[in-house]
Amino acid sequence: MLKKEIDRHSKIIIAGIYAFMVSIAFNFFWLPGNIYASGVTGFVQLIVSIIERFVGLSLSIPFLVLCMNIPLLIISWFWINREFTKYTIVAVLLTSVFMSIIPVQTVVTDPILAAMVGGVLHGTSVGITLNSDFSTGGLDIIGILVRKRTGKSIGSIFIAFNCTVHFLAGFIFGWQYAFYSVLAVFVSGKAVDFVNTKQQKVQILLVTDHSEALVPVLQADLKRGITVVNNVEGAFSKEEKKILFIVASKKDLGRLNQLIKTIDHQAFMSVSPGVTTNTNFYEW
């Protein structure tokens, strides 16, 4: 019970950190530099910019982003995971609040620097939310749903969507803004990949003398399937051992090491990154 309470409060804190960081990235770096974000936020930016330029009407970006997230959050509630969606809702609401109360101001005048610093802040904040078992809303929800249902990524669709937004922004407002926007999204994506270890799969081969004790503990704690290979022999010791074959998230490795050491401190573990799986891999 205590662990669940700590986990719940830590996720709320992380949602707040995300909202603050992404609002700083947006209001201090991207918006003053006319740099367009990716996903729903970038689409809303483009629509607001077009309306302001051709109609003269100023609209609230945070409010429109919140409105566009509502149907996506409903989809997430029913089709992904309600616990996941609860904290995603918190992140989306806090982001709307922070983006509204933090003033837009120019911190740097170099647009390339603004794109890169904003990208690092944005990507890092997105990565920590995904690592904590919830998302930032928007197109992330669609991507997670498709990956959960089919095991496939729709990254190419996201790239096409973002390219369309940035192309239109460049065509209407100037091609330099399209370049800065693409740079910002690229840096943000690299930061997400660096921070978000939960969705990076690794293959683990564990050679042990204590498979009977290890298997139930690992399955209960990590919620991962394990394949046991019997009757293997070490070339040096000539002793019979067993191999445990596991596919897990990179995030699981620290906990996995702790569990193994408590049962078999002489176990040998080999880790291989960059593993692709089908739909039978648990994420949320």
Model-derived segments and their meaning:
Residues 23-27, 55, 117, 158-161, ...:
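Positively charged, small/polar-rich N-terminal and surface patches that mediate targeting and assembly
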Residues 1-211:
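Core subunits and conserved enzymes of cellular information-processing
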